[in-house]
Amino acid sequence: MTRSSIQPKTLSPARISVARLAAAASLALALLAAAAPLAAQTPERRPPGAQPPAAGPGEIRGTVVDGQGSTPVGSASIAVRSRADSSLVAGAIAAADGSFRIQGLRPGAYYLRVSMLGYTPQTSATLTVTPAAPAVNAGPIRLARGAVALAGITATGERQAVAIAPDRNTYAARNVAPAATNASEVLEAVPSVQVDADGVVSLRGNENVVVQINGRPSPIRGAQLAAYLKQLPANTLERVEVVPNPSARQDPEGMAGIINIVLKQNVDLGLSGGVTLAASTADRYTASGNLGYQRGPATVFLSYGFTSDDRSTTGINDRTRLALGAPLSFTEQSISGSSGNGGHNFNGSIDYRLSERNVLSSGLLVNLRGSTDASTSLYSELDATRILLDRYQRIRDSQSDNAMVDYTVGFKRTLQPQRHELSAEGRVNRQGDDDRTGLWRQPVGGTSQLDAEIDRTRATTWQLTGQVDYTRGLGAHTKLETGYKGYARWHDRDYTVLADPLGTGSFAPSDLSNTLALDEQVNAVYGVLSGGAGRWELQGGLRAEYAGRQFSLASTGERFPHSYASLFPSGLVSYKLGEQDQLKLSYSRRIRRPGTQELNPFPVFFDLQNVFLGNPELNPEYTDAIELGFQHSARMGSVQLSPFYRRTSDVIRIIINTADSVAGREVTSVSFQNLDTGDSWGADLNGSLRMGQAFSGLAGFNVFKTVTSGGGGESSLSSNAVTWSARVNGTWNVTPRTALTAAYFYRAPMKIERGRFDAFANANVSVRQKLNGDKASLTLRLSDPFNQQRFRIQAGDDNVIQLTERASTSRAVHVTFQYNFGQAPRVRQPRQQDPPPQSGSPFGG
């Protein structure tokens, strides 16, 4: 802190009791105990090249090779499925030379499903085992590299940390952040992704990024999304996909692109599961369990997670009022307090294969969150010579309860994997929020009067989403993707303020109370054509969209309707320079729609002198993004260089007015305004390194320049800034059972309109010890060992300058225990597990 007199102070902390942790741990362990009898009946995962116990005289053998270089692909997963009902019969993992041999098969018709991280899954033709010919040679099975699969990559293993494709980078969660306890900590370790002290996620320095869960946009945003990611257990994440320039098939929201968090959905064999328990010296606790089961046509996955996170916070808000450049008066605000966050997260999914071609899926997500925030701010009013005029305290005590339920049902018909498919999905989401805040002002030996204020916000949001997608191959190397997506959202919020300005104990409704409603509808159709010829891969698409919103204020009767039509073209060209090198060029148009709080013009006070004001006249902002990329992949790792350029119109920017007046108070207001244009360009340099089994690492460097123009003579709102960030993450396997991991991230200072953000840094170091083979592990992690995590911003003009700084408890020791049982999961996504190629109508039975 700038002033050493600030001391941490804890007020009404939301501390977790031993009983709360024991209850959550008991629930996770109960899941384990219930599944233990079944797990005992589930065969263990076999080592590479091994086969299941003999059940018949048949066998299938073959080799897995790279589709372009014919080099062996070791460690690929081979699943043997029945031709009759697609049920899983047996499985194996290819040896280092790509060979496999699966024995003990009864006479019958089968097919193979072969998958490997960084390659497109491959389905074989029908293989028939008969008493007369029990041995079947599947021959070489060629896998196409993910780098030429424009539809994306399916991660099916954990042996590589990163897979590179023209449109996205895919990071295996367990490899990138082996010591992480929640999704937010996993994202901190992903190159090009930043997570600040408040949990806000950004991509290449841009916070306007869409976070998806299993390919679907998260229905929550802002602080609620940050809280949710901190409650999502890390062991439920399979991989993270970073898509900086999505195609027209994807939703166009997110100016910086898309971060897709793929959760574990189901497993390939029998039953598997796990339990995670974690605790830290900083009052942070986690308990979670997951269970997956596959039998015949049905696949079920369940997970539960509990978190509790209590932190102390310190900070300052210093205001200097100026007259002709000379100090006129000072206000010094010292903040100390505590915050607590906790919640429960449940995720369940069921996939049922109706036939060889048709799959019905259903998913349910329930998230319950609660938080507390208690703080005391000490204000000192000083004159120009820094003589004390007045001193008082502002006490803040708030509680928040949030609940979200998300249900999805989908159908998919596959005639040829990724070549001829039809899918439909419906989704309903409901969120409820109840926030309560009390504010008190008390004199400290001065002349100030005592006052009090009680705020309560109750909000309900419903969203209905429908989507239909159709894929059809047009020849051997060309594919057409087309579809429709629409959603409707209804948001109602009641904001009640009761004020006691004289401190008499009599509260009355304030003029700051208001009720608002936001109705929003979006309908879109898209078409994407992709194909290849020789070393070239091409993709072009167009998305047409019509959107409308109506923002209304019940207290004033005002309505702010706004409707607009948009076109979102996209394109991608990639060229393979050789077996290991590739060039790409991509383009897409993106949109950012203003959120509810950004539109709400009624003031919301953080404290006595800081207020939040929305702008109901905001327009959406559009960004045209171009990216050039070079990728080099080799046995020991990969290197990726990606220069990019973004041009944004109607830029939505946070405007900090240090000399505003609201409800008769002199305040610093935070609002939003559309600026004229914004340009940003820069480059990403990311690399991965793998030195056998001893060492693996990731490193990234990002530099970008941002220029905004206020337009209309608002030169004071313009900015011109250059900033950069760097990240390194390495894992050293000291022994086959012990691994040491260290990570460091640094973001340089950055200019904004009327101000400047200071630098931000974060470090983590951990050691992980395997127990009981690979079934269990114990991890010890030290977070922020140098105590560098803090937020600092300076903003102002010729009249007022304000310095704000915040820091919370971040340096801590974490201990995590994980136990897995049953089959080691080879995770697959329902949209990628396809039956063997068939012919026929996509609408047939």
Predicted feature descriptions by range:
Residues 43-52, 65-71, 77-81, 115-117, ...:
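Short, acidic, small-residue-rich periplasmic hinge/interaction motif at the N-terminus
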Residues 432, 548, 579-624, 645-670, ...:
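Surface-exposed extracellular loop regions of Gram-negative outer-membrane beta-barrel proteins
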Residues 189, 216-244:
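Short acidic/polar hinge/loop motifs at secondary-structure boundaries
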Residues 140-141, 183-186, 225-228, 254-275:
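N-terminal periplasmic accessory domains that precede
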Residues 345-369, 394-552, 641, 679-704:
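Face-selective signature of the C-terminal outer-membrane beta-barrel domain
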Residues 334, 453-455, 463-467, 507-516, ...:
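Outer membrane beta-barrel strand-and-loop segments of large Gram-negative receptors
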Residues 83-99:
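Short, acidic Ser/Thr/Gly-rich low-complexity loop/linker segments typical of extracellular
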Residues 279-314, 327-375, 399-407, 413, ...:
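Transmembrane beta-barrel wall of Gram-negative outer-membrane proteins
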